[in-house]
């Protein structure tokens, strides 16, 4: 059992003075940096801002801190910035380096610990959630078992891919049956 504040730190970002309603939802030559808000569609990245004055983040975890989606948690593997009603946290150990699979596991663990616990009047701000605990697998000597995390996420990915292939094969078989019966 680990407190979030013992594993992560909130990232300070420059304040950007844009209204989401004035920002494009499609990237162009100037407005090309995805901007994080409290939404859950597209991992909260629904608008674009210029790079100028923005704090560019990548390979961090974002957390929605407002509205109906407060506590929604995503691993952000691509460049983005924080616009409003959300924030980003970074891992403070192992030289701040984790693999994508490790980030996915930690994001799921954080989501399980906080999503649905907070609400409009009790927002999931960092000062509140940093005391929440997450459960992580440990090695025999009490360290976080990153090898197990890698293995588990790889196994889950393989199962998902297998199920998608099986589903697709069934759909193809149904389609072929309809075609064969009608032509």
Predicted feature descriptions by range:
Residues 5-133:
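DNA target-recognition domains and sequence-specific DNA-contacting regions of bacterial/archaeal
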Residues 1-42, 139-183:
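Non-catalytic DNA-recognition/assembly elements of restriction-modification systems
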Residues 135-137:
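A short, hydrophobic, proline-anchored segment that marks a local hinge/packing element in signaling
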